[in-house]
């Protein structure tokens, strides 16, 4: 019985663990040319209900296969842009530069010693892969729904990788938002890079250059749009660099490389993580082992334990044993007497008078 309860408890915890694993199975790995992106989900949804309408997508960057950097440290730039479906342009939101990032196994952009970031105007979106935040937005509005681009470039390559994340925003149940399109638009990466243009030119400001995408989009910059400024977030770092860090990113991408980039980097290779299948296999193995142990223990011969006797039971058994011994001794004595009085081969019942 104890084994049965133990097995039931184990099964209950395994079911909870399996459900948690199924929930996490939505994780996806996007493989780029020089760096890969692991996200818990390719899209996130938020329901507007109060003052705290924050949205975030957690994940981290990885080095897979031949993507490992050749040096012990490297610098990297990450830009966050929003696909504006109204004006058909790419709206720059946030830019962060990491310096002196150590090469730590498969982890990318981890424990970087230098960080410099800029916000675009009053944008509330940001990305901070150093703390496993791929996308974060505060005070989300219905108009913020859509597709966001993460452009990542390492300092030892002239090309870059582009990753896409989507945000769904569901408004409150009222009539004021009925005409608002709060679902992300359906655009392919190649269509975005071929059709969309940069909404605003990136100003040169304290080590900043124009957007990495500025070199690759086919359309010219919208010069009629007001050139808004960047706001400095944090310049420098909490630690002193061990060597001179140049935050400027030298980009040598030209229009001739656009076609190659479209074929290799825009349509990233997606790998589904088979967490659910692994959990089911582990669960099946544990069930088989548990059932085998239960059957083996059930087939073993159980020990028979006599219950403890009370004093009254012991005295009664002793008295009955004494009476039986007396009767047995009397019968033996009677048998010996009969054998002496009668011939050896005579048949006489010793218990008759």
From Swiss-Prot:
Residues 310-324 have a biased composition (Basic and acidic residues). The lineage of its organism: Viruses, Duplodnaviria, Heunggongvirae, Peploviricota, Herviviricetes. Pfam families: Herpes_gI. This is Envelope glycoprotein I. In epithelial cells, the heterodimer gE/gI is required for the cell-to-cell spread of the virus, by sorting nascent virions to cell junctions. Once the virus reaches the cell junctions, virus particles can spread to adjacent cells extremely rapidly through interactions with cellular receptors that accumulate at these junctions. Implicated in basolateral spread in polarized cells. In neuronal cells, gE/gI is essential for the anterograde spread of the infection throughout the host nervous system. Interacts with gE. Residues 294-353 are intravirion. The chain crosses the membrane at residues 275-293. It is found in: Virion membrane; Host cell membrane; Host cell junction; Host Golgi apparatus membrane. Glycans are attached at residues 40, 75, 84, 122, 138, 227, 252. GO terms for cellular component: host cell; host cell Golgi membrane; host cell junction; membrane; viral envelope; virion membrane. Keywords: Glycoprotein, Host cell junction, Host cell membrane, Host Golgi apparatus, Host membrane, Membrane, Phosphoprotein, Signal, Transmembrane, Transmembrane helix, Viral envelope protein, Virion. Belongs to the alphaherpesvirinae glycoprotein I family. It is a single-pass membrane protein; Single-pass type I membrane protein. Residues 1-20 form the signal peptide. InterPro entries: Herpes_gI (IPR002874). It comes from the Viruses.
């Amino acid at each position: 019985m104890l084994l049965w309860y133990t097995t039931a408890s184990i099964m209950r915890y395994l079911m909870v663990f399996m459900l948690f694993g199924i929930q996490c199975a939505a994780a996806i790995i996007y493989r780029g040319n020089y760096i890969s992106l692991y996200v818990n989900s390719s899209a996130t949804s938020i329901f507007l209900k109060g003052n705290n309408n924050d949205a975030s997508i957690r994940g981290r960057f990885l080095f897979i296969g031949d993507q490992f950097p050749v040096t012990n440290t490297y610098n990297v730039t990450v830009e966050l842009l929003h696909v504006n479906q109204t004006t058909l342009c790419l709206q720059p939101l946030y830019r962060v530069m990491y310096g002196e990032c150590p090469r730590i196994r498969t982890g990318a952009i981890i424990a970087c010693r230098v960080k410099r970031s800029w916000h675009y105007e009053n944008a509330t979106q940001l990305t901070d892969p150093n703390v496993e935040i791929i996308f974060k937005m505060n005070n989300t509005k219905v108009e913020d729904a859509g597709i966001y681009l993460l452009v990542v470039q390492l300092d030892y390559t002239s090309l870059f990788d582009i990753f896409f994340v989507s945000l769904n925003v569901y408004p409150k149940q009222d009539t004021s938002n009925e005409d608002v399109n709060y679902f992300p638009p359906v655009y392919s990466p190649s269509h975005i890079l071929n059709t969309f243009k940069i909404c605003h030119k990136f100003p040169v400001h304290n080590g900043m250059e124009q957007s990495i995408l500025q070199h690759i989009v086919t359309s010219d910059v919208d010069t009629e749009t007001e050139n808004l400024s960047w706001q400095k977030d944090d310049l420098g770092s909490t630690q002193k660099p061990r060597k001179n860090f140049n935050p400027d990113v030298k980009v040598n991408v030209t229009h001739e490389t656009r076609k190659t980039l479209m074929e290799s980097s825009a349509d990233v290779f997606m790998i589904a993580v088979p967490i659910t299948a692994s959990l089911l296999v582990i669960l099946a193995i544990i069930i088989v082992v548990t059932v085998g142990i239960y059957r083996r223990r059930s087939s073993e011969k159980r020990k028979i334990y006599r219950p403890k006797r009370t004093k009254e039971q012991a005295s009664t058994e002793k008295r009955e044993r004494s009476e039986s011994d007396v009767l047995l001794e009397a019968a033996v004595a009677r048998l010996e007497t009969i054998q002496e009085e009668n011939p050896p081969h005579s048949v006489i019942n010793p218990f008759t008078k």
